[in-house]
């Protein structure tokens, strides 16, 4: 079964060409983004042409080729634009396994609550 996470990635319209170029060079990244994502909002996430991808219960391991290509894509986005151009949020199975990267899309965040 393995350890699974819920992940959201959003990027600005300015970052989309970098995303598409990276996906064009990596079949694994293309599959991750355009086949494996449970939800895709392509150009219509906000009124500015941003993209959003949402994966639920995904094995998000740095050693996987798709994740390596994804991380390289993020590096290119930061290099060409900056960290305001994206937001990546990952919630793991463990209560303290939460990660947030990028400074764009501040309305995407982790919310904890008590359920009963």
Regions found by a protein language model. Give the residues of each.
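Charged interaction segments
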Residues: 23-116
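Short, extreme N-terminal segment that most often corresponds to the first beta-strand
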Residues: 1-25
């Amino acid at each position: 079964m393995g350890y699974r996470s819920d992940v959201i990635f959003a990027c600005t319209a300015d970052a989309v060409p970098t995303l598409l170029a990276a996906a064009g060079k990596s079949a694994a990244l293309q599959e991750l983004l355009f086949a494996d994502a449970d939800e895709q909002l392509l150009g219509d996430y906000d009124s500015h042409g941003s993209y959003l991808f949402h994966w639920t219960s995904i094995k998000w391991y740095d050693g996987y080729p798709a994740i390596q290509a994804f991380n390289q894509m993020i590096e290119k986005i930061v290099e060409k634009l900056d960290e305001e151009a994206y937001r990546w949020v990952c919630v793991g199975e463990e209560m303290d396994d939460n990660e947030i990267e990028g400074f764009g899309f501040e309305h995407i965040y982790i919310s904890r609550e008590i359920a009963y």
